[in-house]
């Protein structure tokens, strides 16, 4: 009898051409995206996890609940009141907290509020109105650079001890880097000689659009000059700031609340106080 030749292959000795994708253990399989490096997805997951942990630790160690802290922070940054006034307002609501504790809350959460709010702002247009105002810090006058677009939407701000070309360049770089801004087509400024020098150097280095136009027309800056009052009226009850860092953090909170109240946040009205409170609670992942 003739026996047909057959290939007997043991499972452990299976040649490579007989192995299918289904027979390979899942731990040995990896999928590669044409646009993503092998370790990128894992690094992104770690970054997301770290961000979630940072948000969870936002109110860790505080002796008051998150809703009380955010209520105090929101009201201080919204209205021209002092820390002692806010202490009495909280006491009227049966919350006993010292005004120095409220000060620490503002220093801790004002900058964080401004940072988390930026991705939720509507896009501004390319017509910038730039001006600087004065803020008293430890008995000295400092310069607060501010910029709004033609519709009055806040673009960015910067507190500086000097008023020169380097300070103007730092401000322009900071403003262009924000997620809700575009490279400007026109920049309207006052007669300060530092602005043309800063704009020319940044165009040469490719940091500003080479066709952007710098206009030194004073009356066109009425929009930003009128917008200064949102910050000036809030800083008056405090009679100035004690240090540069204290001023920088507090002003960041003032500007963030001004953006919200001007209706710059997406789908949030400027007069809808309840929606604004929910937005701030959402930014800090707290139940409103």
Please tell me what each predicted stretch does.
Residues 63, 162, 166:
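Conserved phosphate-coordination/catalytic loops
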Residues 154-155, 184:
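Short, solvent-exposed beta-strand edge segments and adjacent coil->beta transition regions
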